[in-house]
């Protein structure tokens, strides 16, 4: 309240949180774009050689975990979105299984639709819990094949979903 008894309300948006499962070279521009938007980014990978915080200066955390222990090692409820992009079928299956049992609202999977269907078959009943939240192939069709173009399409889709937008022109 001010001296006239007026109350002002300031709307403050919560900072989006992004989990990237897979710290390969193509995750670098995804992390960079997310950090440029002010998002809090955590990267995880099961491969020790990929877990190098120096490659991801925009990330809050870069963590080596076993893919099958994602839900035990990372508090998934703190994330608004997750992108699975390790390029390792078995690891991606473990990441998706943990995310299926979570409340993460947006889950993206890098790769073609055939890969998604193969992983869904392996997930069994868990696939049903994930189907409505999963975007696979991840990203908007913006054109371009470079890691940066793909990262832009991914982050654009996450931004649209988090803000309940279609990602269509104004």
Model-derived regions, located:
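Segments forming oxygen-rich coordination pockets for charged ligands
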Residues: 1-46, 50-63, 77-81, 122, ...
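Short beta->alpha junction loops/turns
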Residues: 23, 88-89, 112, 143
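Adenosine-phosphate binding glycine-rich loop
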Residues: 105, 109-170
């Amino acid at each position: 309240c001010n001296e006239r008894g007026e109350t002002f309300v300031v709307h403050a948006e919560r900072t989006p949180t992004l989990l990237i499962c897979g710290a390969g070279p193509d995750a670098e521009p995804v992390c960079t774009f997310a950090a440029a938007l002010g998002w809090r980014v955590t990267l995880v990978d099961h491969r020790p050689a990929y877990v190098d915080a120096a490659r991801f200066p925009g990330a809050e955390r870069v963590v080596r975990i076993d893919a099958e222990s994602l839900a035990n090692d990372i508090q998934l409820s703190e994330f608004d979105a997750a992108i699975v992009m390790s390029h390792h079928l078995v690891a991606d299956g473990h990441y998706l299984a943990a995310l299926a049992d979570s409340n993460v609202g947006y889950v993206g999977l890098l790769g073609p639709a055939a890969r998604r269907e193969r992983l869904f078959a392996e997930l069994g009943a868990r696939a049903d819990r994930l189907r409505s939240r999963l975007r696979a192939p991840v990203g908007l069709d913006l054109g371009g094949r470079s890691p940066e173009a793909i990262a832009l399409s991914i982050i654009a889709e996450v931004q649209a979903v988090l803000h309940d937008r279609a990602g269509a022109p104004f």
